[in-house]
């Protein structure tokens, strides 16, 4: 079975950079703007740059929210990136809108009792908490590029990796079943980001082979 990946276009995502990253991995990405665009896909990407409430409002306008919820409920793969990670939770301190509620938990301000600047911007090293398809088993450094002012507080069993912020560890990757998300930008994280996307792609190919 071919791997057909769709990236959700709701006006607040860095689509071109993500597409280029997958192009370097010889994987094409199709644009998803409406529920009808999802039919040919067997994996989805939810990117995001900006603020929580406008993002949820834009998603509502696409009529994709029910489709995204049923997609994840059916165990189909979805990858959230940056703001996309925050949107899959129930709520955010940044706004008043309900999130997608695909994972239990909420999004909170980054810790203020630190000398670290907010937004957290730049390269940081991941600390793996549990195995997940986004992280390969190679013993290599995982420096990723972050730009964010808020951090998700997931259920402990859904936390896959953290990153240091001052004296705190904040969420970097979450994973549950076939739903995963990263707070950083893999498409802007050089070889480390490419390796992460390649790991996800390999997992997708294996998953699709099992279904064919």
Swiss-Prot record:
InterPro entries cross-referenced by the UniProt entry: Class_I_gatase-like, GATASE, Imidazole-glycPsynth_HisH
Family matches, as Pfam families: GATase
Biological processes annotated in GO: L-histidine biosynthetic process
Cell compartments where the protein resides: Cytoplasm
Major localization listed first in the record, in broad terms: cytoplasm
E.C. number(s) listed in UniProt: 4.3.2.10, 3.5.1.2
GO cellular component: cytoplasm
Keyword list, A-Z: Amino-acid biosynthesis, Cytoplasm, Glutamine amidotransferase, Histidine biosynthesis, Hydrolase, Lyase
Stretches of the chain forming a coiled coil according to its record: none
UniProt key word Cytoplasm: yes
Metabolic or biological pathway, per its Swiss-Prot or TrEMBL entry: Amino-acid biosynthesis; L-histidine biosynthesis; L-histidine from 5-phospho-alpha-D-ribose 1-diphosphate: step 5/9
Active-site residues from the entry: 82, 185, 187
Catalytic reactions of this protein: 5-[(5-phospho-1-deoxy-D-ribulos-1-ylimino)methylamino]-1-(5-phospho-beta-D-ribosyl)imidazole-4-carboxamide + L-glutamine = D-erythro-1-(imidazol-4-yl)glycerol 3-phosphate + 5-amino-1-(5-phospho-beta-D-ribosyl)imidazole-4-carboxamide + L-glutamate + H(+); L-glutamine + H2O = L-glutamate + NH4(+)
One Gene Ontology term of the molecular function aspect: lyase activity
PROSITE patterns: GATASE_TYPE_1
Domain Glutamine amidotransferase type-1 intervals: 4-210
Protein's job: IGPS catalyzes the conversion of PRFAR and glutamine to IGP, AICAR and glutamate. The HisH subunit catalyzes the hydrolysis of glutamine to glutamate and ammonia as part of the synthesis of IGP and AICAR. The resulting ammonia molecule is channeled to the active site of HisF.
Assembly and binders: Heterodimer of HisH and HisF.
Protein's recorded name: Imidazole glycerol phosphate synthase subunit HisH
Organism phylogeny: Bacteria, Bacillati, Cyanobacteriota, Cyanophyceae, Synechococcales
């Amino acid at each position: 079975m071919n791997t057909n990946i769709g990236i959700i276009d709701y006006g607040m995502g860095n689509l071109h950079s993500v597409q280029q990253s997958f192009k370097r991995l010889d994987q094409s990405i199709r644009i998803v703007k409406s529920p009808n665009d999802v039919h040919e896909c067997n994996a989805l990407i939810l990117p995001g740059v900006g603020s929580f409430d406008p993002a949820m409002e834009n998603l509502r306008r696409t009529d994709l929210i029910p489709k995204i919820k049923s997609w994840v409920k059916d165990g189909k793969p979805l990858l959230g990136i940056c703001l996309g990670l925050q949107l899959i939770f129930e709520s955010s301190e940044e706004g008043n809108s309900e999130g997608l509620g695909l994972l239990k938990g909420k999004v909170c301000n980054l810790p203020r009792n630190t000398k670290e600047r907010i937004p957290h911007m730049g390269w940081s090293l991941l600390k793996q908490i549990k195995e997940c398809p986004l992280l390969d088993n190679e013993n290599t450094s995982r420096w990723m590029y972050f730009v964010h002012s808020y951090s998700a507080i997931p259920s402990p069993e859904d936390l896959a990796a953290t990153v240091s912020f001052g004296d705190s560890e904040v969420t970097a990757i979450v994973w549950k079943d076939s739903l995963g998300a990263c707070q950083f930008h893999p498409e802007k994280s050089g070889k480390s980001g490419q390796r992460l996307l390649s790991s996800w792609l390999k997992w997708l190919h294996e998953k699709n082979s099992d279904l064919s």
